[in-house]
Amino acid sequence: MTEIRVLIADDQALVRAGLAALLDLEPDITVVAQAADGAEAVALAGNLPVDVALLDIEMPGLTGLEATERIVAAGRETRCLMVTTFDRPGYLRRAFDAGASGFVVKDTPAAELAEAIRKVHAGLRVVDPALAEKSLLAGPNPLTPREQDVLREASHGASAGQIGRALYLSAGTVRNHLSSAIGKTGTANRTEAAAVAARNGWL
């Protein structure tokens, strides 16, 4: 039986410990390390023999998506399996764009999570069926990278001037990007546009 060495990265200590305890019950899975954020996960994956990195998509600092990009870019054999509490369809496409091998939600039963790890380790792709359906229905992210940047800043309550200073754009350019994003999301204002984009995992 091949041993699968797993790294768990989640900013919630209880979640990490719970996942580790459940996975350690599997005869072929060994949790070799735990990380509290994406940066720690990247460092551990670079220094330890890790077959599968189980990464929470939303962590402070370096996100699970960014950590996945770095782990994959390092050229190691580690495969990344994204885990999230949010079934936002846009996350699925972004995860695969980052180089992830799979995507599951956190309430996946332990036996199914273990099976997902085995499949990813074997070189297969794993996707939560409900999330895959939502992703197909939602379609691709309609926002340009710059519109995403502008909406991200707007979601924190920044004015057009403040957004412009943060992104080195003129206030007029910011307003144009906001107007375009509002149109694409079918909303009435920047607050609604940011909320819709966040809900769909486009930011």
For each of these PLM feature ranges, what is it?
Residues 10, 56:
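Active-site residues of response regulator receiver
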Residues 34-52:
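Acidic, metal-coordinating helix/loop segments flanking the phosphotransfer/catalytic sites
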Residues 37-40, 60-66:
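Acidic catalytic/metal-coordinating carboxylates
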Residues 43, 65-77:
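Short amphipathic alpha-helix used as the core "switch/output" element in two-component signaling
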Residues 86-87, 172:
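Short, conserved "switch-loop" micro-motifs in signal-transduction and mechanochemical regulators
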Residues 90-97, 101-149, 202:
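Short, flexible helix-to-coil linker/hinge segments that flank and couple to helix-turn-helix
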Residues 159-192:
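Recognition helix of helix-turn-helix DNA-binding domains
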